[in-house]
Amino acid sequence: LECEICTAPGLECNSWTKTCDANQDTCVTFQTEVIKAPVSFTFISKSCGTSDTCALNYVQTSPHNKLTHKSQRTCCTGEECKTLPPPVLEHKVNQPDGLQCPGCFGLSTKDCTEHLVSCRGPENQCLSITGKEFGFIFRALSYKGCATESLCSLFEKRFWNVLEDVEVDFKCTPALPKSSQ
């Protein structure tokens, strides 16, 4: 299987073609929006992937009350990829859903200072990630925040194994109502 590979701001990217690894059986296109109210940043990404994650086409997470990351994706193979329109994200602001989680984000560290985050829209899980050895990008990562069940399922399927030598520990627990914390 060959797939286009690229990442760029906006809705289109200039890609090159890559032969996927043996365990990768689909091409994936992500449309991602990072919202730091009132500003939002959109980018597109194309890569090889595994078809067992295709049903998890919408994921969302918030590590901070003013920061939300959401991503819509489509999967395709062969000629279908040439005609399939890119995934479309709804540009709506999800309102708080009455749940909350600890939230924080730290690069180059496995610890970060937590604060409570109000979950939004479909986010009903608390996600905690620690990772190390992200190649040349950074040595460590610590992340906590609200997340959709679909994002937790993606982590359960170890979707990051397309990255070389990445060690990631993650845990998802149900988000709690605001009054109970």
From Swiss-Prot:
Keywords: Disulfide bond, Phospholipase A2 inhibitor, Secreted. Its main location: secreted. Expressed by the liver. It is found in: Secreted. Coiled coil: none annotated. InterPro entries: CNF-like_PLA2_Inhibitor, LY6_UPA_recep-like, PLipase_A2_inh_N, Snake_toxin-like_sf. CDD domains: TFP_LU_ECD_PINLYP_rpt2 (cd23572). GO terms for cellular component: extracellular region. One of its GO terms (molecular function) is phospholipase A2 inhibitor activity. Disulfide bonds join C3-C27, C6-C13, C20-C48, C54-C75, C76-C81, C101-C126, C119-C146, C152-C172. Heterotrimer of 2 subunits A and 1 subunit B. Strongly inhibits its own venom PLA2 and all other PLA2s tested including Elapid, Crotalid and Viperid venom PLA2s, as well as honeybee PLA2s. Belongs to the CNF-like-inhibitor family. This is Phospholipase A2 inhibitor gamma subunit B. The lineage of its organism: Eukaryota, Metazoa, Chordata, Craniata, Vertebrata.
